[in-house]
Amino acid sequence: MAKKSMIVKALRKPKYKTRQKNRCKLCGRPKGYMRDFSMCRICFRNHASAGLIPGVSKSSW
């Protein structure tokens, strides 16, 4: 889990646009971020497996 201070810091508008770091809306994880869903890969996998994200299904071939 991300530190609470880092999550709050990421929510503030940065002075320069290049300093912005995307974070997961659910857990605050900065890495493995998926822009389309605004969450990290771990939270995405959990929500997709539970069927909480409409239109997403497990692929198999």
Swiss-Prot record:
Q: List the GO terms this entry assigns under cellular component, sorted alphabetically.
A: cytoplasm; small ribosomal subunit
BP-aspect Gene Ontology terms: translation
For this protein, what does the record note about how its cofactor is bound?
Answer: Binds 1 zinc ion per subunit.
Q: Where does Zn(2+) bind?
A: C24, C27, C40, C43
Function noted in UniProt: Binds 16S rRNA, required for the assembly of 30S particles and may also be responsible for determining the conformation of the 16S rRNA at the A site.
What organism does the UniProt record list as the source? Borrelia duttonii (strain Ly)
The cofactor named in the record is:
Zn(2+)
Keywords, ordered alphabetically: Metal-binding, Ribonucleoprotein, Ribosomal protein, RNA-binding, rRNA-binding, Zinc
InterPro entries (alphabetical): Ribosomal_uS14, Ribosomal_uS14_bact, Ribosomal_uS14_CS, Ribosomal_uS14_sf
Instruction: Report the protein name in the record.
Output: Small ribosomal subunit protein uS14
| Record lineage | Bacteria, Pseudomonadati, Spirochaetota, Spirochaetia, Spirochaetales
Whether Endoplasmic reticulum counts among this entry's keywords is: no
Q: How does it assemble?
A: Part of the 30S ribosomal subunit. Contacts proteins S3 and S10.
Query: Keyword Magnesium: yes or no?
Result: no
Q: Which family does it belong to?
A: Belongs to the universal ribosomal protein uS14 family. Zinc-binding uS14 subfamily.
Gene Ontology MF, one = zinc ion binding
* Pfam families on file: Ribosomal_S14
